[in-house]
Amino acid sequence: MDRLQTALLVVLVLLAVALQATEAGPYGANMEDSVCCRDYVRYRLPLRVVKHFYWTSDSCPRPGVVLLTFRDKEICADPRVPWVKMILNKLSQ
């Protein structure tokens, strides 16, 4: 029984890590005007969950786009990745 519980715990921890989203947030010297992405989401988001997007500040050290979901989560994504480009194109139409 202990092995089953341990295996279940390991699976749940791995699932939590895999589903972890990188949320957008301000950081840096001028936190009021800049939103930067420290990291990008590691999994593909389906278009149906994204309602809006906005670009991160030009003062950020790396390019980023923040995808706003229908559940009002702000998720950082790499604008150079093909699936992100597709979402940006669809939402810009």
Curated annotation (Swiss-Prot):
Molecular-function annotations in GO: CCR chemokine receptor binding; chemokine activity
Secreted in keyword set: yes
Primary residence: secreted
Keyword Methyltransferase: no
GO cellular component, one term: extracellular region
GO biological process terms, semicolon-separated: antimicrobial humoral immune response mediated by antimicrobial peptide; cell-cell signaling; chemokine-mediated signaling pathway; chemotaxis; eosinophil chemotaxis; immune response; inflammatory response; positive regulation of cell migration
Tissue expression per record: Highly expressed in macrophage and in monocyte-derived dendritic cells, and thymus. Also found in lymph node, appendix, activated monocytes, resting and activated macrophages. Lower expression in lung and spleen. Very weak expression in small intestine. In lymph node expressed in a mature subset of Langerhans' cells (CD1a+ and CD83+). Expressed in Langerhans' cell histiocytosis but not in dermatopathic lymphadenopathy. Expressed in atopic dermatitis, allergic contact dermatitis skin, and psoriasis, in both the epidermis and dermis.
Listed Pfam families: IL8 (PF00048)
Similarity-based family: Belongs to the intercrine beta (chemokine CC) family.
Function in brief: May play a role in the trafficking of activated/effector T-lymphocytes to inflammatory sites and other aspects of activated T-lymphocyte physiology. Chemotactic for monocytes, dendritic cells and natural killer cells. Mild chemoattractant for primary activated T-lymphocytes and a potent chemoattractant for chronically activated T-lymphocytes but has no chemoattractant activity for neutrophils, eosinophils, and resting T-lymphocytes. Binds to CCR4. Processed forms MDC(3-69), MDC(5-69) and MDC(7-69) seem not be active.
Name used for this protein in its record: C-C motif chemokine 22
Annotated organism of origin: Homo sapiens (Human)
Gene that this polypeptide is encoded by: CCL22
